[in-house]
Amino acid sequence: MATGKIVQIIGAVVDVEFPQSDVPSVYDALNVKDSKERLVLEVQQQLGGGVVRCIVMGSSDGLRRGVEVVNTGAPISVPVGTKTLGRIMNVLGDAIDERGEIGAEELYSIHRPAPSYEEQSNATELLETGVKVIDLICPFAKGGKIGLFGGAGVGKTVNMMELINNIALQHSGLSVFAGVGERTREGNDFYHEMQEAGVVNIEKPEESKVAMVYGQMNEPPGNRLRVALTGLTMAERFRDEGRDVLLFVDNIYRYTLAGTEVSALLGRMPSAVGYQPTLAEEMGVLQERITSTKQGSITSVQAVYVPADDLTDPSPATTFAHLDATVVLNRNIAAMGLYPAIDPLDSTSRQLDPLVVGQEHYDTARGVQQTLQRYKELKDIIAILGMDELSESDKQVVARARKIERFLTQPYHVAEVFTGDPGVYVPLKETLRGFKGLLAGEYDDIPEQAFMYCGTIDEAIENAKKL
C-alpha cells in the first residue's frame, strides 16, 4: 500500500503528495492515519508532481500537514445485501444507529457503470399510489423515475412520506432511503415511523424491509455528494438479485449543491447561476444508474427542491430530462389550503397514454385538465366583472372546476398527527368513478364544501348530507 502525506488543507479539499511511482487513481479511497475516527479521502484530481487533490468524507477539523495517508487502491466500498436492512448508515457504509457493525459479507464500490442498453428493460406496469391526483394526472410506472418538485415548505417531504407509507408498506419488496443533505430531525422521525409501521424490526433485523443511508445538512460537502451513490449502490445490489426495489432520495437538489461546493473548492470555473460546469454530467452519472434491468426493477421517487420556485433554474431543469413522471407542487394551491398542493396542470407523466392507462382513464384525466384550464382562463374575467357576466356554460365550468379542485385534496396518513383526520388510500377505480361523475355533471347539486378532504365520491355525498 502506497503512503503519502498531506501537504495542503483548504476546508473540505486536501492535497496529498505520493511518490511519483505510486500515484493513486481518480476515485481511489485514501485512509488517514492517526485520526481518532475513520477518515477517508476520495481522489478527485491529479495535479502532477505526485500530488493528488481529494475531497474529505468527513470533517477536516484537526487535520494537519504532514499526516500520513494510505492508498487503499480501490474506490469507496460499502456493505450491500440483506445485512443492511433495518440499519442506518453513513456515506462510507458505517452504522450510525449505535447497534453494532453491519457485518455484511460483501462490499460494492459506489462508482459503478450504468447497465448497458441490452440489459435495460421497459416499464409499462402501473404503480397505484392511493393518492387521487397522482393516480389520475401523473400515474407512476413500476420501474420508473418520479420527481417531486416544489419550493420550500410546499410539502415535498410529506408527499414523499405518504408515498413511502402507501407504496412501501403495501409493496412486499425492499426499499432504500437516501437522505441527501436534509434535516437530521426528518431522518430521525422517519426511522421511528418505520419502526412503528413494522418496516424496521429491531429485534429481527433480517425481517426489516428498508435500508437507510443518511448524509445530513450539517455534514461536509463530500458526504452529501456521495451519499446518493451509496444508497443507489445498495439498491442496485437488491435489483441484481432479481428483486423489485423502491429507492427514495430526499433531496436531489442537495446533491447538486454539494457538487457546486466541491467544484468551487477544486478550483473549477462556475457556469450558469454559479453551478458546477459538470452539472449535467454529474446528474447523468447518478440518474443513468437508476434504471430497471431484465433481472429486477428500481422504482425511484426523488424530491427536488426548486430554488425560489423557479423551475427554469439549471438544477431542477437538468433533473427534468431524466424523469418518467413529474409531480409539481404549487405554492398558490398550498396558499388556498388545498393539500396535497400538486398542480394538475403542471404535473406530467409518460404513462398518461391511452395505450398504457386505457382510453377511459386518459379521457377523464384530460377532461379534468381542460376544465381546470378553462377555469384558470376565466379567473381574470371573474376578478374584473364578477360571476354574473359569465355565460351559463362558463358558470357551469367554474362550478365543476371548483369541485374538482376540492376533490383533488385528500387526508394523508402521515399528516394524521397534525390534522386529526384519518388518512385515506383511494383505489384508482374509485378515483376514476368520482372524476368521471364530476365531469358528466352527476354531482352538480352537491355543494363544493362537501368535496374538501374526502377520499371517495361516496364520502363527498355523505358530507353533503351533514351540511
Swiss-Prot record:
SUPFAM superfamilies: C-terminal domain of alpha and beta subunits of F1 ATP synthase, N-terminal domain of alpha and beta subunits of F1 ATP synthase, P-loop containing nucleoside triphosphate hydrolases. ATP binds at residues 150-157. Keywords: ATP synthesis, ATP-binding, Cell inner membrane, Cell membrane, CF(1), Hydrogen ion transport, Ion transport, Membrane, Nucleotide-binding, Translocase, Transport. It is found in: Cell inner membrane. GO terms for molecular function: ATP binding; ATP hydrolysis activity; proton-transporting ATP synthase activity, rotational mechanism. Its main location: membrane. Its EC number is 7.1.2.2. It is a peripheral membrane protein. One of its GO terms (cellular component) is proton-transporting ATP synthase complex. It comes from the Bacteria. InterPro entries: AAA+_ATPase, ATP-synt_VA_C, ATP_synth_F1_bsu, ATPase_a/bsu_AS, ATPase_alpha/beta_chains, ATPase_F1/V1/A1_a/bsu_N, ATPase_F1/V1/A1_a/bsu_N_sf, ATPase_F1/V1/A1_a/bsu_nucl-bd. It catalyses: ATP + H2O + 4 H(+)(in) = ADP + phosphate + 5 H(+)(out). Belongs to the ATPase alpha/beta chains family. Produces ATP from ADP in the presence of a proton gradient across the membrane. The catalytic sites are hosted primarily by the beta subunits. NCBIfam families: atpD (TIGR01039). F-type ATPases have 2 components, CF(1) - the catalytic core - and CF(0) - the membrane proton channel. CF(1) has five subunits: alpha(3), beta(3), gamma(1), delta(1), epsilon(1). CF(0) has three main subunits: a(1), b(2) and c(9-12). The alpha and beta chains form an alternating ring which encloses part of the gamma chain. CF(1) is attached to CF(0) by a central stalk formed by the gamma and epsilon chains, while a peripheral stalk is formed by the delta and b chains. This is ATP synthase subunit beta.
